[in-house]
From Swiss-Prot:
Co-factor requirement: Mg(2+)
UniProt-recorded name of the protein: Phosphoglucosamine mutase
The keyword Transcription appears for this protein: no
GO biological process, one term: carbohydrate metabolic process
Function of the molecule: Catalyzes the conversion of glucosamine-6-phosphate to glucosamine-1-phosphate.
Keyword Zinc: no
GO MF, one example: phosphoglucosamine mutase activity
Keyword terms of this UniProt record: Isomerase, Magnesium, Metal-binding, Phosphoprotein
SUPFAM superfamilies: Phosphoglucomutase, C-terminal domain, Phosphoglucomutase, first 3 domains
Organism: Dechloromonas aromatica (strain RCB)
GO CC annotations, alphabetized: cytosol
Highest taxon, organism lineage: Bacteria
Cofactor note: Binds 1 Mg(2+) ion per subunit.
Length: 450
């Protein structure tokens, strides 16, 4: 059964257009509340409670009120925390023993988009079957709980401080960051009032950029998806390294002292390489988009590697199935399940810095064992749900591309789970060949989608 509203990371879209409207979000909250009531194993007389956080988008205030109203109408208690990173909501949901956590965010997207994503009581993304149960109730009539049974709403005042202390607890007690000058780019997003404090309190000399949100500038030429600002700031401040988060702080990119950028594959490798020195690493999970060089570098360390579907939720599922701890995406979602239940940009950066402290040297030296293969990714706009597999011209061009690579690389064609895009990715040893093959295939997709 396909999902009508949920993508790979919750419900997302343009604010004011279906489904990101106040009416829909209220019904989403109500349906989620009823689903929680139906599945709750709480003692009789108790009622479930949820945590609602958001990033810094202006539309977050409107959607927060709608979501709050929906849960209250269903008879579910609501705890509000205001702007807070997505992984902070996951942590606090678990720490406060609540039944679900909800984040109002469109992650790395521009301010005019927004979305809703859910976490379970364990701080993990909801399973597909629970999302389907929520979807099934969205289009049903709302029946408000009796006045005496409406959910109460309260604000958690110490949420920021609790999460800062949690992040610090994931860094080794016998290490600190004294002597390091670090530039941190918070993308004018949810970590603007948190990330600088974490690294400062651990001893680093911190320079902050992207920490002046105005509701409209989230991810605007800053953050993990626009790292040029960070590269320039690292060089201008003569910093040792830079850290870039996205709007909801669940993904990470880093920059060394020379302005070289490192993606999720490289940072995951640094963490795993360091951890493997102290204890065996059973395996690492990536995705279909993970660079082949990561797989080959891990093989040299005798560490198995497996690919999940794109989306950090599927990486988590694979890690759980295999009993592994480490995984991630090249986009910067990095998982260390012995530290957190979900991808966390701040926690991941701390794990890289711990590796840097334990192994010595610079960030560039730390990542010297992994040279990425050239990879070309082209996003082609298409109608949502575009059936590309039914277009002979596309499937034929895809097959021709695979033949042309002659085993020297790979090609991937997949629909985005969050945007109306078809992603064309070609990877191989020769950069010129890779670029040519990707552009040729993308041109066929573009023509077929018209």
């Amino acid at each position: 059964m396909t999902r009508k509203y949920f993508g790979t990371d919750g419900v997302r879209g343009r604010v004011g257009q279906s489904p990101i409207t106040p009416d829909f979000v209220m019904r989403l909250g109500y349906s989620a509340g009823k689903a929680l009531l139906g599945r709750s194993e709480m003692p009789a007389g108790d009622r479930p409670a949820v945590l609602i956080g958001k990033d810094t988008r202006l539309s977050g205030y409107m959607l927060e009120s709608a979501l709050e109203a929906g849960f209250s109408a269903a008879g579910v208690e609501v705890c509000l925390v205001g702007p807070l990173p997505t992984p902070a909501v996951a942590y606090l949901t678990r720490a406060l023993r609540l039944q679900a956590g909800i984040v109002i965010s469109a992650s790395h997207n521009p301010y005019y988009d927004n979305g809703i994503k859910f976490f379970s009581a364990q701080g993990t993304k909801l399973p597909d079957e629970v999302e389907r149960a929520i979807e099934a109730g969205i289009d049903q009539p709302m029946v408000c709980a009796p006045p005496a049974d409406l959910g109460r709403v309260r604000r958690i005042e110490d949420a920021r401080g609790r999460y800062i202390e949690f992040c610090k607890s994931t860094f080794p007690n016998d290490l600190d960051l004294r002597g390091l000058k670090i530039v941190i780019d918070c993308a004018h997003g949810a970590a603007y009032h948190i990330a600088p404090s974490v690294f400062h309190e651990l001893g680093a000399d911190v320079v902050s950029i992207g920490v002046q949100p105005n509701g409209l500038n989230i991810n605007d030429a800053v953050g993990a998806t626009a790292p040029k600002a960070l590269c320039e700031a690292v060089l201008a401040n003569r910093a040792d390294l830079g850290i870039a988060l996205d709007g909801d702080a669940d993904r990470l990119q880093m920059v060394d002292a020379e302005g070289n950028l490192y993606d999720g594959d490289q940072l995951l490798y640094a963490i795993v390489r360091s951890r493997a020195r102290s204890a065996p690493v059973k395996g690492v999970a990536g995705t279909l988009m993970s660079n082949l060089a990561l797989e080959h570098a891990l093989a040299k360390l005798n560490i198995p590697f497996a690919r999940a579907a794109v989306g950090d939720r599927y990486v988590v599922e694979m890690l759980s199935e295999k009993g592994w701890l480490f995984g991630g995406e090249n986009s910067g979602h990095i998982l260390a399940l012995d530290r957190h239940t979900t991808g966390d940009g701040i926690v991941a950066a701390l794990q890289v810095l711990a590796a840097l402290r334990e192994l010595g040297g610079s960030l560039k030296e730390l990542l010297g064992g992994l040279v990425l293969y050239p990879q070309k990714l082209i996003n082609v706009p298409v109608m949502r749900g575009f059936p590309w597999k039914e277009h002979p011209a596309i499937t034929s061009a895809l097959a021709d591309t695979e033949v042309s690579l002659q085993g020297r690389g790979r090609v991937l064609l997949r629909a985005s789970g969050t945007e109306p895009l078809l992603r064309v990715m070609v990877e191989g040893e020769d950069a010129v060949e890779v670029t040519y093959a990707a552009e040729k295939l993308a041109a066929v997709v573009r023509e077929s989608a018209q």
